Regions:
Chain C
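Transmembrane alpha-helices and adjacent helix-loop boundaries
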Residues: 1-343
Length: 423, 292, 343
């Protein structure tokens, strides 16, 4: 019979194939991998394919566009930034493979803006073991802010609990007697928003709590239940597509409650893309959301980012994701500029921890040696007449306490090209 | 009570689309003894054509007709160009080829049109009629139900009452004998594929306006649920596809409404397991398929 | 005995090969070893008994969860217990996947081809929901203990290489019994059931128990493969075992050649390496076509390769090897489509 001999041959062949794939590079163990005389190489993992690509593939494109603009204007310390974007299709095992390749093969200086809670959780321990700076994670999970456990990991988004608490606080102030309900994604995102709402509103006072799963693009049953429960203010911990679906489904039922939406699902231009330009302004009128990045139509940052989007991103649709991606790029460039003439992994982390980075938010960054969260306060936005803008109300959330604070927008300087700190 | 009526009505409308897609799987199974794993990707290709035609002409109906024609053409092309060239002794090469085709079509669509969701307008209002204070079916839901029922009826007539239907079934069940009797078996298989993908395209065209919008993955879940529906109903049985489709639609709606959204796939799995344990060939299994 | 020697030899060769690989390649090798164990189980199931399972990813996940839960518990109860956590974890993986395999196998014994396919497909879709409803950590999954390089070796090898060794050893332990099973009496019984159930029953082989046993025998290596992935990644998430991955396992089994363990090895290496190779090749081409091409082109080319390979060699790589060894063409397979396609 053929079996054992053939098995041996085939296995040997497979092993030989694997050996043939071997490249001769070994990871450099110096302190500044990815840094040459004229380049700095960094990497990220993003969902470029698969169902999650629809919402998020625009972010890394915007970041790349900002870096192209930066490189055309001299880069940082004379070095161009090379941004390697790896696709993980929002699959945690693909993230594992992508990030290991970035660290060991591409020898990146840092991982920047890795997207997603389940995906990035999968590489958190690995990046910690390898002591790779893990900057500006693109998710609102509280996991990223554990300086004692993960000294090199830093969050970028305001966390979901903060957003939920701010939305609930605004709802209570605007409409003290309204019936509040929550619709959330069936994961840490929805749970975080709910937790935030519960810090402001007593859990029993939430009339209806519904969840959805991204696999099933239908929220009719959930919206029906909320309508039956007489909800007046619906706090949504939903991604943009499901925000649109919730609003559209309610409209079909002739139901017009107030929508209070987390920043991850309350981006007006993206929602218009889902709902269609003809009906969106009416359906989204009065929608409340939160944000911490420049988004007012007349903001100089927005004007600059629009220009970069036209020049370096083929004029892709300009949405909240565009601002998000470019803001991440700017913040990294600022950190790199502050990390010194010859940046290392350690000096990059030290630069972020120094607390001296400004970013470009409407509220201050909160990075420090003991705090790896980026934004602890958020501003309320409202859609009026097809324009989403800040109301001026800003909440800071700390240890379950919501307090009103003043906005402190960072002014645009030097055309968005970070300068090395003065000696 | 109000909530029950609302959930039942919603479930029926969703179930009609499921039933139609499951029917398309039954057609290709009857015609070629194959489960087409690329059915969703092929249907979505046809929807993109329908979408483009509607956008260009402004007429939903022109887009619908174009989408159906494109589905039929795609089905015939895939059968002639790919499936026919594979050995039919086992279903596996056809299945693997279909999985490869899914990758090619979905990434091709994503390259050509981007991953964005494109909103598709329904031809009728989605605001439900309110009866006794309870919102029930919308005009669009009724359109979906009527269309699905009409297509089911037409196909039942085709298979039971016409010579073409007879030849289609004969070619699938007894290809050798049919050939001897003068049935052009290869042509029958091609016709079966074309009919099947056209039906799947119709189901997808009906589904997309109720979802987020058209994207390369718009029909993925539809396929998976419809496959479960076809298996529950019995792969040979159009009536089974109809009954199981409506049943699964209602089950998903009730589970989502009364338990939680994440419990719905488990409920479908439980129903599927229960039915198969009691009737291994599905609810409406023909006697021949039940021997085991 | 010869099989055992051969298995030991191949295992040693594979371990020796890890010295020629850099850390990332060793990580890929560990992944491929885990996938190999699962594909080997699947290929024996489909090739010998004709039962088409689309749900082997869930069996892998069951093994991964079993490993993570048990190993974490043992690690917490007795830290520094050395290999105890690993061994207990592997036992947990085998138990979890074996139990699920038994349940599925009992259902599968009553079902024919597409019906079993439908059931296992629904199982894959239900996995994320099950992870939410059961205490399996939801979307984030469970984490498994990190196994550092033993001190005696730490000067010699990196952690990726150590994990590759573990992966190779576990996979060898998972697949070798499968090879023995396939060559021995159980293999004959399975083939008898595949050939003609009625004839097999007349010859005293009861098809039901044989099919169920084959499912369990296929599920345990798959579960150990899941444990291998948990060792290499320290994580089990439902997202890692989705529909696409489950279908990829079937693709690997068929491309390798059904029923062939060597083919399973080729298939596993292909599905791990090919997308990455294509991706690398695509990156080398200056792509000014914008972000849409990014990632998608790799999937497209992978799909095209799968189609081309199926058209060229429906019997897979193992069939191609057999053809190369034996210059005279094999006897033509009967091409009559008949009712037995309804397996």
């Amino acid at each position: 019979m053929h079996t054992p001999a053939r098995t041996a041959t085939a296995a040997a062949l497979a092993a030989a194939t694997a050996v043939a794939l071997a490249a001769c590079s070994t990871p450099a163990d110096d302190e500044a991998p990815g840094v040459t005389d004229d380049t700095v190489t960094i990497g990220t993992h993003q969902p470029l394919t698969g169902p999650a690509a629809a919402g998020y593939s625009a972010i890394s494109a915007a970041t790349s566009a900002y870096f192209a603009y930066l490189n055309d204007n001299g880069g940082v310390h004379g070095r161009d930034i090379e941004y390697i974007v790896k696709d993980d299709g929002y699959d945690p095992s693909a993230t594992q493979s992508a990030v290991r390749e970035l660290v060991t093969e591409d020898e990146v200086l840092a991982i920047v803006n890795g997207l997603g809670t389940p995906t990035h959780s999968a590489v958190l321990d690995y990046l910690d073991e390898q002591e790779v700076p893990d900057l500006f994670v693109s998710s609102g999970s509280l996991t990223w802010n554990q300086p004692g456990v993960y000294p090199n990991t830093f969050a970028f988004n305001a966390d979901y609990v903060t957003e939920g608490a701010a939305l609930a606080q605004y709802a209570v102030e605007q409409r003290p007697d309204a019936t509040i309900c929550v619709l959330g994604q069936d994961d840490d995102y929805g749970e975080g928003i709910l937790e935030g709402v519960e810090t402001v509103v007593d859990g029993n006072a939430i009339a209806e709590i519904q969840t959805y799963s991204t696999a099933n693009e239908d929220v009719t049953a959930q919206i029906g239940a909320m309508m039956a429960a007489g909800c007046e203010v619906n706090v949504l911990g939903t991604i943009n597509g499901f925000t649109a679906m919730a609003v559209g489904t309610a409209a079909a039922l002739d139901w017009a409650p107030q929508w209070y939406v987390s920043s991850s699902g309350g981006d007006y231009p993206t929602l218009v893309g889902y709902l269609g330009e003809d009906v969106a302004p009416a359906l989204l009128q009065g929608m409340v959301s939160v944000n911490y990045l420049p988004f007012s139509p007349d903001d100089p940052w927005v004007a600059l980012f629009r220009q970069i989007n036209d020049d370096y991103n083929d004029g892709a649709p300009f949405t909240g994701n565009t601002v998000f991606g470019m803001s991440v790029g700017y913040l990294f460039a600022e950190a790199l500029a502050a990390a010194g003439e010859d940046p290392t992994r350690a000096s990059l982390v030290a630069a972020v921890e120094s607390g001296e980075l400004l970013g470009n938010g409407i509220v201050p960054l909160s990075y420090g040696p003991d705090d790896h969260a980026a934004y602890r306060s958020v501003g309320i936005t409202v859609v009026d007449d097809g324009v989403q803008d800040y109301t001026g109300t800003v909440y800071s959330v700390d240890a379950g306490q919501v307090t009103t604070v003043e906005a402190e927008p960072v002014p645009l300087a030097n055309d968005g090209i970070p300068q090395p700190p003065e000696e | 009570m109000d909530r029950l009526v609302f959930l039942l009505a919603t479930g029926l409308a969703r179930g009609a689309v499921l039933a139609l897609f499951a029917l398309s799987l039954v057609i290709v199974w009857r015609a070629a003894r194959a489960v087409n794993f690329a059915q969703a990707a092929m249907a979505v290709c046809a929807v993109y054509i329908a979408f483009a035609l509607t956008a260009a002409s402004g007429s939903y109906w022109l887009g619908l007709a174009g989408g159906l024609a494109a589905g039929a053409a795609l089905g015939a092309a895939v059968e002639r160009g790919l499936m026919r060239r594979l050995p039919h002794l086992t279903p596996l090469p056809g299945m693997i080829c279909a999985i490869g085709l899914v990758m090619v079509l979905q990434s091709g669509l994503a390259i050509a049109f981007g991953p964005e969701h494109r909103p598709m307008r329904p031809p009728f209002s989605q605001s439900p009629f309110v009866i006794g204070g309870v919102p029930v079916l919308s005009p669009y839901d009724l359109f979906v139900l009527v269309t699905a029922a009409a297509v089911m009826g037409a196909l039942a007539l085709l298979f039971a009452g016409t010579s073409l239907g007879l030849r289609l079934r004969a070619a699938a069940f007894a290809p050798e004998t049919s050939r001897l009797l003068g049935v052009r078996v290869p042509r029958m298989v091609t016709i079966g594929w074309a009919l099947s993908v056209a039906a799947a395209a119709l189901a997808a065209i009906l589904l997309v306006p109720t979802e987020l919008g058209l994207n390369p993955h718009a029909a993925d879940l539809l396929f998976v649920n419809a496959f479960a529906v076809a298996v529950i109903g019995g792969l040979d049985s159009p009536a089974g596809a109809l009954a199981a489709g409506l049943g699964v639609g209602v089950l998903v709606s009730l589970t989502t409404g009364y338990v939680s959204a994440s419990a719905a796939p488990l409920a479908v799995l439980a129903l599927l397991t229960a039915v198969l344990l009691l009737r291994p060939g599905g609810l409406f299994a023909a006697r021949e398929a039940r021997r085991a | 005995m010869r099989t055992l020697l051969r298995a030991a030899l191949i295992t040693l060769l594979a371990i020796a090969a890890t010295f020629g690989l850099d850390p990332f390649r060793n990580y890929q090798l560990a992944t491929a070893a885990g996938v190999f164990a699962a594909v080997a189980g699947l290929t024996v199931l489909i090739g010998l008994t004709g039962q088409l399972s689309l749900g082997h990813a869930v069996l892998m996940a069951a093994g991964g969860y079993g490993y993570a839960a048990t190993a974490t518990a043992v690690d917490a109860a007795a830290p520094d217990a050395g290999p105890a956590a690993l061994l207990a974890g592997l036992a947990g993986a085998a138990a979890a996947s074996g139990a699920l395999g038994l349940l599925l196998g009992m259902a599968a014994a009553r079902l024919r081809g597409p019906y079993l396919a439908g059931l296992t497909l629904a199982l894959v879709i239900a996995l994320p929901s099950a992870a939410n409803v059961l205490p399996l950590g939801g979307e984030q999954g469970l984490s498994a203990p990190f196994l550092p390089v033993p001190e005696a070796l730490s000067a010699l090898i990196a952690v990726e290489q150590w994990h590759a060794w573990l992966a190779i050893l576990i996979s060898a332990a998972a697949v070798t019994p499968l090879v023995l099973l396939r060559a021995g009496r159980p293999g004959l019984r399975m083939r008898a059931v595949l050939g003609d159930e009625t004839a097999a029953a007349l010859a005293g082989v009861r098809p039901g128990p044989v099919k169920t046993a084959a499912f369990v025998a296929s599920a345990v290596p798959a579960g150990l493969g899941g444990a291998v992935l948990a060792v290499a990644t320290q994580q089990v998430t439902p997202g890692g075992y989705g529909l696409a991955f489950s279908l990829t396992l079937v693709v690997a089994a068929v491309i390798g050649g059904l029923g062939s363990i060597g083919g399973a090895a080729i298939g596993a290496v292909l599905v791990v390496a090919l997308p990455w190779l294509v991706d690398t090749a695509v990156e080398a081409v200056p792509a000014d076509l914008g972000q849409r091409l990014n990632g998608n082109l790799a999937v497209l080319l992978f799909g095209a390769v799968v189609i081309a390979a199926t058209l060229a060699r429906p019997d897979g790589a193992a069939g191609l090897l057999a053809r190369l060894r034996r210059p005279t063409p094999a006897a033509p397979t009967p091409a009559t489509p008949s009712t037995n396609t309804e397996r």
